Amino acid sequence: MIMILYWSLPMILFILGLFCFVSNRKHLLSMLLSLEFIVLMLFFMLFIYLNMLNYENYFSMMFLTFSVCEGALGLSILVSMIRTHGNDYFQSFSIM
């Protein structure tokens, strides 16, 4: 029973984060926050899975390191976008 709770809660929160990421496309900051929430839920599911199989947590630390680098890269893109465009509206940003 407790294992179902361990797996269902992160899955529900992961799906909720995906829904927020897809539906909230107005500001880049809100998209980055929902993306970090998705990565946090993936880390939580990976941690539960590795502990269930009695593996070491080395891979989870590597995953956490890469997710921190992804967050820093997203913040640097946000700062450069605010400096060049003056706001973080995602519709005003053209990739081309």
UniProtKB/Swiss-Prot annotation:
Per UniProt, what is the name of the gene that codes for the protein in this document?
mt:ND4L
Protein name, as recorded = NADH-ubiquinone oxidoreductase chain 4L
Q: Upper lineage ranks?
A: Eukaryota, Metazoa, Ecdysozoa, Arthropoda, Hexapoda
* Keyword Iron-sulfur tagged: no
Gene3D superfamilies, per database record: 1.10.287.3510
Give compartment(s).
Mitochondrion membrane
Organism for this UniProt entry: Drosophila yakuba
Membrane-spanning residues:
2-22, 28-48, 62-82
What Enzyme Commission number(s) does the record list for this chain?
Answer: 7.1.1.2
Q: How does it sit in the membrane?
A: Multi-pass membrane protein
